[in-house]
Regions:
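Acidic, glycine/proline-rich Ca2+-coordinating loop motifs
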Residues: 1, 24-142
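N-terminal secretory signal peptides that target proteins for export/translocation
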Residues: 1-9
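Bacterial N-terminal signal peptides
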Residues: 12-23
Length: 142
C-alpha cells in the first residue's frame, strides 16, 4: 500500500517543489506586466462627482457608470462616463456632466460631449449601449 504522507515527506519531492516554486516565481517576476498611468497623455480628464452632501446617502457611495462603444462607427472604441450630480445641501458652481470621449485611434481621446449632445447633468450611476431600435446604430441608454 502506498502512503501519501510518506511520498510527500521524501526529500526529493520537497527539494523539487521548492526549486519549482523559486524558478516559477523568478520567471513570473521578470516577465510581469506593468500598468502605467497614461491618463494625462490620453486626453481623458474626468473627476467623479458623488453629490457630497455629507448625509451619507447611498448614492454617495456609488461610482461612475462607463460604456465602451463605437459611437461614430470609425472602428475605434469610444468611452462614455456617467457622472453624479448635486444632492440636497450641495451646490457646485459648475454642474457635473456626463462625458463622451472619442477615440482618435492613436491612444488619444477627444471630448465630444457638446458635439454629440450627450452632456446630461442629472444624477446617473450607469449606462448601457445596444441597438435598441434596430436601425443599425448603437444607442446609449443612461
Amino acid at each position: 500500500m502506498i502512503s501519501f504522507a510518506s511520498f510527500f515527506a521524501r526529500p526529493y519531492f520537497l527539494i523539487s517543489s521548492l526549486l519549482s516554486f523559486f524558478v516559477l516565481n523568478q520567471i513570473s517576476a521578470e516577465n510581469a506586466n506593468q500598468f502605467v498611468d497614461v491618463t494625462l497623455e490620453s486626453g481623458i480628464n474626468f473627476r467623479h462627482h458623488d453629490g457630497r452632501s455629507g448625509q451619507k446617502y447611498l448614492l454617495e457611495t456609488l461610482g461612475s457608470g462607463v460604456s465602451f462603444f463605437d459611437y461614430d462607427n470609425d472602428s475605434y472604441i469610444d468611452l462614455y462616463i456617467v457622472n453624479g450630480a448635486d444632492l440636497p445641501g450641495c451646490v457646485s458652481p459648475i454642474p457635473p456632466t456626463n462625458i463622451l470621449y472619442r477615440n482618435n485611434g492613436d491612444g488619444i481621446f477627444t471630448d465630444v460631449t457638446a458635439i454629440a449632445g450627450v452632456g446630461n447633468t442629472q444624477y446617473g450611476v450607469g449606462c448601457a449601449t445596444a441597438d435598441y431600435d434596430n436601425d443599425g446604430d448603437v444607442d446609449l441608454y443612461i
